[in-house]
Amino acid sequence: MISRAAAPSSSIASLSSRSLRAQAPAARSFATVQDNAPPVKHYGGLKDQDRIFTNLYGHHGADLKSAMKYGDWHRTKDIVLKGHDWLISELKASGLRGRGGAGFPSGLKYSFMNFKDWDKDPRPRYLVVNADEGEPGTCKDREIMRKDPQKLIEGCLVVGRAMNANAAYMYIRGEFYQEATVLQRAINEAYEAGLIGKNACGTGYDFDVYIHRGMGAYVCGEETSLIESIEGKAGKPRLKPPFPAAVGLFGCPSTVTNVETVAVTPTIMRRGASWFSSFGRERNAGTKLFCISGHVNNPCTVEEEMSISLRDVIDRHCGGVRGGWDNLLAVIPGGSSTPVLPKTICDDQLMDFDALKDSQSGLGTAAVIVMDKSTDIVRAISRLSTFYKHESCGQCTPCREGSKWTMHMMQRMEKGQAREREIDMLQELTKQVEGHTICALGEAFAWPIQGLIRHFRPELEARIREYSKEVGGNGPYAGGWHPEARAEGKLISPGM
């Protein structure tokens, strides 16, 4: 017990309690926390006046007169006369990144052809536009070619001036007959108006535009395969270096870039880099075309602000997921080659390069494939494996053999005809393919499978156990591996 003598007097006690209260920090109320917190910025809800592709839904004609009425070819002469240095610096300041999937900074990419003493090089220089849109789920470039062809042609002139190119070659997917027809008609109109060709737009700059139609090979979407195809060779990737900027089309300096990346450039030059960079998060600037398909009420292609949330773009423009957001199973966010994301991640997912990379997926071409709970997710990824096996050019052994093995293994996983340890083997196989092929097709068939195993492994394991019960397999026969399975046609194994 504390003695009375040791106890402080009431005056001393009140003084020390006041001093303690003065030293202690003030309690932070809810309002105080909110006042000191940085404001949260929400992305999306792009206004019509900020949309670059004003004719995405074909509300007006695709002819030159209609295009000029809506702002195309406005003061293009002034833009071209500013020279390549200004164009490159403006593109770098805008933060534009490639819209074909890789997301490489466009201003930096276009500067590669302006190497030291480039003007002393007697070789012609080419801009190559990749319009070979073959990624399953992707349908943005074809809308530009069908509805806004003049925007693409004007973009070719501006981008070509930035890299001092003499001509542009547009490589169009072979199945795009209507798109090629509309685009050729638009090119003819531009030639007749003096906008391209000799003394393009009255600038003294000569620039021609040509169309080259492909023959349907998916691998020709890779830049060096595309170049090989234009040259009349088999569409197979080249080893790099040398890079196309040094030795490209016909052995001349060339830059291969996406349709959307080219088409947005003139608008950026007219409105300014600061306008474009005001949209989206840092390093993810601008607007983007999103192709939303699958189990939504209104599938569409729409232009929206970068960094918009996945749920917002689906609810705002597609009428939501079929059966409601709670009926969502998974989403492939950037075309068939990007890893699938489950609903738990999709709830708060932002749609830009860095945010999707943090979620172990990718923006890719921004082709959003929505799958509700009625989807057989294993079968969906198995179908993609079949597609990539069919489209492999066979040049690289890891891709040629790996795509075949993964296709057969996914067909087995689809039916549960496997052992649980084979899931790990399949994942290891896909990781061994990454980085060991000339082009990115190896990663394209590996990543969807990795995403499936990462997020839906319990589904694979459940199928294996279910099939094991059906055939009465235990121990060495689990998963259907019994001696008569092959003869009965119940087992699908590599090599059958």
UniProtKB/Swiss-Prot annotation:
Membrane topology according to the record: Peripheral membrane protein
Residues holding [4Fe-4S] cluster: C393, C396, C399, C439
Cofactor: FMN; [4Fe-4S] cluster
Residues that coordinate or bind FMN: 214-261
GO cellular component: mitochondrial inner membrane
Keywords, comma-separated and alphabetical: 4Fe-4S, Electron transport, Flavoprotein, FMN, Iron, Iron-sulfur, Membrane, Metal-binding, Mitochondrion, Mitochondrion inner membrane, NAD, Oxidoreductase, Respiratory chain, Transit peptide, Translocase, Transport, Ubiquinone
InterPro entries to which the protein is assigned, alphabetical: ComplexI_51kDa_subunit, NADH-UbQ_OxRdtase_51kDa_CS, NADH-UbQ_OxRdtase_suF, Nuo51_FMN-bd, Nuo51_FMN-bd_sf, Nuop51_4Fe4S-bd, Nuop51_4Fe4S-bd_sf, SLBB_dom
Cofactor note: Binds 1 FMN. Binds 1 [4Fe-4S] cluster.
Subunit description: Complex I is composed of about 40 different subunits. This is a component of the flavoprotein-sulfur (FP) fragment of the enzyme.
Family: Belongs to the complex I 51 kDa subunit family.
Role, per record: Core subunit of the mitochondrial membrane respiratory chain NADH dehydrogenase (Complex I) that is believed to belong to the minimal assembly required for catalysis. Complex I functions in the transfer of electrons from NADH to the respiratory chain. The immediate electron acceptor for the enzyme is believed to be ubiquinone.
Protein name according to UniProt: NADH-ubiquinone oxidoreductase 51 kDa subunit, mitochondrial
Native organism taxonomy: Eukaryota, Fungi, Dikarya, Ascomycota, Pezizomycotina
